[in-house]
């Protein structure tokens, strides 16, 4: 059974998504990040409002939560999003190490509304050079120097 507080935070994420659509400012996505029963951050999709293809509700809420908490890990936080996260947001969620994610609609629901991520998942499975946007590896040896120096750096902050 889902706790009432989870429903409250999810209802807010859904409300944010509706407000965003009704205002004409962006897509139907809202997100809330909570910790210990309190909202830490909330956001809506701002892709078209900011001309930033990475301005998804989840990414923006993660950025805000990290700034407010002064850390880059959100291990004790919950994320509530009006829709199942896209591949980019899923990556951000894992990098932020959130405790748990609650989502409303499915990726298939988003696809029906024109937000179809299936092509991205298919692209990830392709070899680099065969992707729609070909990815060509060059200068690996030179690029590895930064990793070698990182590994040798005392006092680094791993993440």
Summary of predicted features, one role per range:
Residues 3, 47-48:
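A short, polar/acidic, helix/strand-boundary loop motif
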Residues 47, 81, 105:
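Residues that line or immediately flank small-molecule/substrate-binding pockets and catalytic motifs
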């Amino acid at each position: 059974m889902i706790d009432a507080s989870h429903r409250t935070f999810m209802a807010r994420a859904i409300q944010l998504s509706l407000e965003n659509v009704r205002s004409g400012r962006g897509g139907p996505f809202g997100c809330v990040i909570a910790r210990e029963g309190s909202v830490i951050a909330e956001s809506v999709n701002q892709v078209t409002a900011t001309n930033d293809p990475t301005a998804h509700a989840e990414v923006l809420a993660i950025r805000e939560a990290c700034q407010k908490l002064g850390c880059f890990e959100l291990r004790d936080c919950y994320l509530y999003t009006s829709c199942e996260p896209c591949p980019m947001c899923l990556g951000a969620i894992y990098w932020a190490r959130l405790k748990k994610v609650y989502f409303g609609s499915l990726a298939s629901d988003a696809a029906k509304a024109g937000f179809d991520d299936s092509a991205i998942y298919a692209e990830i499975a392709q070899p680099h050079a065969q992707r729609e946007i070909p990815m060509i590896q060059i200068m690996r040896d030179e690029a590895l120097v930064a990793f070698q120096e990182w590994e040798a750096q005392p006092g680094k902050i791993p993440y």
